Amino acid sequence: MRVKGGSVTRQRRKRWLEKAEGSWGTRNTSYRIARQTVIRAAEYAYRDRRNKKRDFRKLWISRINAAVRELGYTYSQFMNALVKANVVTKDGQGLNRKMLSELAINNPEAFNQLVNKVMK
């Protein structure tokens, strides 16, 4: 006797198609392609949640470097001076790169004072 799956198969397929809503073309109507789309989207999301952390760190370093170079120093010299002055520590205490980047953008005067104080 032939088994068609009935409501179980329909529910499973409906679940995949609902997850593929918002996709373009056949990707949200064809079960097979919709399922591939959802799986690939999940893989990209997983990968990019990790890449996001790298990208933001790169951005913060670039901003700090640009702000410090205006004052005649390099990023590595500045970070070394911060570590020696115990402003930045390895265990996460003190200022981090995100804070320094925000300070450089939103309050350049305070950032310049910090640089001048640390680089003496």
UniProtKB/Swiss-Prot annotation:
- The UniProt entry's coiled-coil ranges are none
Which InterPro entries does this one have? Ribosomal_bL20 (IPR005813), RIBOSOMAL_L20_CS (IPR049946), Ribosomal_protein_bL20_C (IPR035566)
Q: Which Pfam families match?
A: Ribosomal_L20 (PF00453)
Kindly give the CDD domains that the UniProt entry links to this protein: Ribosomal_L20 (cd07026)
Is Lyase set as a keyword in this record? no
Q: Name one GO cellular component term.
A: ribonucleoprotein complex
BP GO annotations: ribosomal large subunit assembly; translation
Instruction: List the keywords (alphabetical).
Output: Ribonucleoprotein, Ribosomal protein, RNA-binding, rRNA-binding
Q: Name one GO molecular function term.
A: rRNA binding
**Record keyword Ribonucleoprotein present:** yes
Q: In UniProt terms, what function does this protein have?
A: Binds directly to 23S ribosomal RNA and is necessary for the in vitro assembly process of the 50S ribosomal subunit. It is not involved in the protein synthesizing functions of that subunit.
The record's similarity note reads: Belongs to the bacterial ribosomal protein bL20 family.
Q: What is this protein called?
A: Large ribosomal subunit protein bL20
Q: Which organism is it from?
A: Ureaplasma urealyticum serovar 10 (strain ATCC 33699 / Western)
Q: What is the lineage of its organism?
A: Bacteria, Bacillati, Mycoplasmatota, Mycoplasmoidales, Mycoplasmoidaceae
